[in-house]
Amino acid sequence: MVWEVKSNQMPDAVQKLLLVMDKRAPGVSDSLQLLQCKETLPSSPGYNSCDEHMELDDLPELQAVQSDPTPSAIYQLSSDVSHQEYPRPSWNQNTSEISENTYRENEVDWLTELANIATSPQSPLMQCSFYNRSSPVHIIATSKSLHSYARPPPVASSKGEPAFPHHWKEQTPVRHERANSESESGIFCMSSLSDDDDLGWCNSWPSTAWHCFLKGTRLCFHKGSNKEWQNVEDFARTEGCDNEEDLQMGTHKDYGSDGLKLLSHEESVSFGESVLKLTFDPGTVEDGLLTVECKLDHPFYVKNKGWSSFYPSLTVVQHGIPCCEIHIGDVCLPPGHPDAINFDDSGVFDTFKSYDFTPMDSSAVYVLSSMARQRRASLSCGGPGGQDFERSGFSKNCGSPGSSQLSSSSLYAKAVKTHSSGTVSATSPNKCKRPMNAFMLFAKKYRVEYTQMYPGKDNRAISVILGDRWKKMKNEERRMYTLEAKALAEEQKRLNPDCWKRKRTNSGSQQH
């Protein structure tokens, strides 16, 4: 039995529903007789009744609903992940003759694509509880304004003092408040910041508490009245006071105003967590040196280099900032410094365009970058938008074998050199070593320490001890090694896709 819904034109132009019941088709079992309705209901006055038609007068009158002719933005997540960047007619013989200038006017760059994906309903950023704010989000980005950190300095005051120390003082309360709600979330989220609207890029990045140091960093000055370890938040709060007593005691308002030069670095354990112990030189003898303890993924903006870190793979996962490797002698700049400007599409931006991510981690940068990468891959392979892809700016970003390829290759080469273990063996181009997993990275880091703790034990016994220590570690402690192993594995898999395939050398497989 088939039920249909038909509309019947009434004299008063009111549509009503008519339920039409078809007769039972031949061959249908008699057990379906109960489904047939043989009762004839009285129809409305003035209309003829029929055995096959039933008019239901108690149904509400139907009213035509005017649909909005303008299509809404639809974000579909499929094998060819895409989003609606701007209205564009589908390709046919008529639209193929449209000039390229029409499309170039609506071109969007790599950052805008990520921004559009980030604001889609499927984006994990839209599901953040702290994202729902009253003020709108303004996203107008270019490679020249990659981060709000690398901004031109504000207008200098009339007193002739440097502009950037004054800038820290004014922005410290706002940035500190933002760090509590966003940096602790563990993902790369976007926010609506009224004080950054004029920058053209309102992407919140991990906020500095003082100078170039993030929340959670510990400071120890080698000179001055206070040589004890102190949290950077407490120090910044003290520096924000304008008491005359503090000024007479000698504060550090202009400390390292031209940047901090890295003198030494080492890894240590503080409060049960692996940290970096760094020593900086402010450039003036009277100020003295500074030693800090920060997290392994702490990013620094280095003069003439851009964003840098000791563990770039961890930094890009935790903060969403692709970095170069930092070295001894690099000068770390504070926010607002005249040299802290993203200069001419630096290697950091090229690394960001060439870095390969997977949505294996809950971090939003993995998800968004993977969505954009899948879309670019589908378009470059001759998809429905292949011709539009060639017109856009992504073709030159992804197809140029220039600095983006070199930057990622150099980072990978350094990572392999740093994390390689065992005897060095000559590897041919056709044979590559598999990257180390999380436990191997952990064992490499602490093998020397455990060997000194247990003298007389061979390498196998030390491995057993390390394995027991690994099993007792918490998931939070393992996460650092897991993320680093993922980043190294994905980068090596991208550069050497065949290294994951075990080739058979027997005669049976060679006959295929």
Curated annotation (Swiss-Prot):
PTM remark: Ubiquitinated by the CTLH E3 ubiquitin-protein ligase complex, leading to subsequent proteasomal degradation.
| Matching PROSITE patterns | AXH, HMG_BOX_2
UniProt keywords (A-Z) are:
DNA-binding, Nucleus, Repressor, Transcription, Transcription regulation, Ubl conjugation, Wnt signaling pathway
What are the BP-aspect GO terms? regulation of transcription by RNA polymerase II; Wnt signaling pathway
Q: What Pfam families has UniProt attached to this entry?
A: AXH, HMG_box
- Looking at the UniProt record for this protein, which Gene Ontology cellular component terms does it annotate, in alphabetical order? nucleus
Determine the domain of life of the protein's source: Eukaryota
InterPro entries from the entry? Ataxin_AXH_dom, Ataxin_AXH_dom_sf, HBP1, HMG_box_dom, HMG_box_dom_sf
Domain AXH, by residue range, is 201-343
Q: DNA binding happens at which residues?
A: 432-500
List locations, semicolon-separated.
Answer: Nucleus
Region Disordered: which residues? 151-180
Q: Listed GO molecular functions? A: DNA-binding transcription factor activity, RNA polymerase II-specific; RNA binding; RNA polymerase II cis-regulatory region sequence-specific DNA binding
Q: Where is composition skewed (Basic and acidic residues) in this entry?
A: 167-180
Q: What does this protein do?
A: Transcriptional repressor that binds to the promoter region of target genes. Plays a role in the regulation of the cell cycle and of the Wnt pathway. Binds preferentially to the sequence 5'-TTCATTCATTCA-3'. Binding to the histone H1.0 promoter is enhanced by interaction with RB1. Disrupts the interaction between DNA and TCF4.
Q: How does it assemble?
A: Binds TCF4. Binds RB1. Binds the second PAH repeat of SIN3A.
- Put simply, this protein is called HMG box-containing protein 1
What species is given as this protein's source? Answer: Bos taurus (Bovine)
Q: Which gene encodes it?
A: HBP1
